[in-house]
């Protein structure tokens, strides 16, 4: 590459800011400006450079203003608020030469804004992302809630460890068909599926998996992070094939079930423990805990027998209930 071309390419990709670097490239021609958000804040000085070998006859416009903002190959602006963000375009002779989109990431009292996603407050405050795994294969699902329904974009990236990252691939975030109601308000639910590239289900985990969701709403940028071991987000599927078998000369029945198809194998190593409960219309019997896949219970008319599972050796989340009717 010719030295002059190298200089042009370098300047076309870089925005110059104040000595504290508060501007970075999210993707090609999209830049994040980090701002301290308080009254009379000075903002950030941003220098935009037109991606062209031309030197003369260049003018600048913004989608936030109908006026010509300046002329020349560079444009210096002061970014203080959302009215200063948006798309900037350099022109010559009526032709658009290049565009740069500025998004704002605001910080108030030293804390980055979290306006886009709903705080689910479980298992602790500031829990914006929730993730679960059905087994130890390295596949997991994450989801989040938002009240916003338009002008919204998400991207997800993940890795195991930061010093020596191992690949975790995440798909595109998808909007669930059903809304989620929380505190008498409806939210949109987004989910994403992720898979660790190389994993040994039986190996002890030493490096945390980190998931980062980048959210853009109009001209606002935010990011949200969750870190975990797979073992800490395990939630098996419910037991399958529940069956009731009457016992001779007894008011009891034998309820039996099988491991869910999605659970890790061999089951002799990846073992589950189970909780069994008879649930009537107005009463729930005492829960029974066991490692085997059958139990004897007293099954009343109009009652259900329900069973749930969790990892036997590590205190994972309990699965949802599987149930079978006594009648």
From Swiss-Prot:
Domain called Fibronectin type-III: residue spans: 238-327
Alphabetical UniProt keywords: Cytokine, Disulfide bond, Glycoprotein, Immunoglobulin domain, Signal
Protein name (Swiss-Prot/TrEMBL): Interleukin-12 subunit beta
Family label: Belongs to the IL-12B family.
GO MF entries: cytokine activity; cytokine receptor activity
Ig-like C2-type domain location: 23-106
Keyword field contains Nucleotidyltransferase: no
SUPFAM superfamilies, per database record: Fibronectin type III, Immunoglobulin
InterPro entries: FN3_dom, FN3_sf, Hematopoietin_rcpt_L_F3_CS, Ig-like_dom, Ig-like_dom_sf, Ig-like_fold, Ig_sub2, IL-12
Glycosylation sites: 223
A Pfam family per the record: IL12p40_C
CDD domains xref list: FN3
Known partners and oligomeric status: Heterodimer with IL12A; disulfide-linked. The heterodimer is known as interleukin IL-12. Heterodimer with IL23A; disulfide-linked. The heterodimer is known as interleukin IL-23. Also secreted as a monomer. Interacts with NBR1; this interaction promotes IL-12 secretion.
Extent of the signal sequence: 1-22
Disulfide feature: 50-90
Record's GO cellular component terms: extracellular space; membrane
Its biological purpose: Cytokine that can act as a growth factor for activated T and NK cells, enhance the lytic activity of NK/lymphokine-activated killer cells, and stimulate the production of IFN-gamma by resting PBMC.
């Amino acid at each position: 590459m010719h030295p002059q071309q190298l200089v042009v390419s370098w300047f076309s990709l870089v925005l110059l800011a104040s000595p504290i670097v508060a501007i970075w490239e999210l993707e090609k021609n999209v830049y994040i400006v980090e701002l301290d958000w308080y009254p009379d804040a000075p903002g950030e000085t941003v220098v935009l450079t037109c991606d062209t070998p031309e030197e003369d006859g260049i003018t600048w416009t913004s989608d936030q203003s109908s006026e010509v903002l300046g002329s020349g190959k560079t444009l210096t602006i002061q970014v203080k608020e959302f009215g200063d963000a948006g798309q900037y375009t350099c022109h010559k002779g009526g032709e658009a030469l290049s565009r740069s989109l500025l998004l704002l990431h605001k910080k108030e009292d030293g804390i980055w804004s979290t306006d886009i996603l709903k705080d689910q407050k479980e298992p602790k405050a500031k829990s914006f992302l929730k993730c679960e795994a059905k087994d130890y294969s390295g596949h997991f699902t994450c989801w989040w809630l938002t009240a916003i329904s338009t002008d919204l974009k998400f991207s997800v990236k993940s890795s195991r460890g930061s010093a020596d990252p191992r690949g975790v691939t995440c798909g595109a975030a998808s909007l669930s068909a059903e809304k989620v109601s929380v505190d008498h308000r409806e939210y949109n639910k987004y989910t994403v599926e992720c898979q660790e590239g190389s994993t040994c289900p039986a190996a002890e985990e030493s490096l945390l998996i980190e998931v980062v969701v980048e959210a853009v709403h109009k001209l606002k940028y935010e990011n949200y992070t969750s870190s975990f071991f797979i073992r800490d987000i395990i939630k098996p599927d419910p037991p399958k094939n529940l069956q009731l078998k009457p016992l001779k000369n007894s008011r009891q029945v034998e309820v039996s079930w099988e491991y869910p198809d999605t659970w890790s194998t061999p089951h002799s190593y990846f073992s589950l423990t189970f909780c069994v409960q008879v649930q009537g219309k107005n009463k729930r019997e005492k829960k029974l805990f066991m490692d085997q896949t059958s139990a004897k219970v007293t099954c009343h008319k109009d009652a259900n027998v329900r069973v749930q599972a969790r990892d036997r050796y590590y205190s994972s989340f309990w699965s949802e209930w599987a149930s079978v009717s006594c009648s």
